């Protein structure tokens, strides 16, 4: 999904590509890694990002918390790097560390991604769907998608809550 925000300092001039917000409820680490790689490819092909910077989101930043959900994101990050060694991906990162440069410097010093992410990968569908709808409704962002990935051509799935402006 493309999120066009009113905040140009985030993402790529206010544009973020996010996943998964519509398909896989509880992805395992391998599925999450594939989502990361596909979402970065979508960032290039659909959003025109020359340099996708992928943040694997969590409630923890680089070991600040210990939990099996965090372990899944760490494993998925490792697998994503194996699937695409050229991919710029880091995780686990909290959303503020991924998006806000000053926070990223504090929580993940030396990170190329922290504070500069333009692609966000959510740990599960529940988090992704809630996050995108909050950003869309409360942050007045335009949401384009969800875009189904991993098939021959991109497909857009419309939310029942979308407006005519969301379609066109």
Mark where each language-model region is:
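Anion-binding alpha/beta catalytic cores of soluble intermediary-metabolism enzymes, centered on
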Residues: 1-168
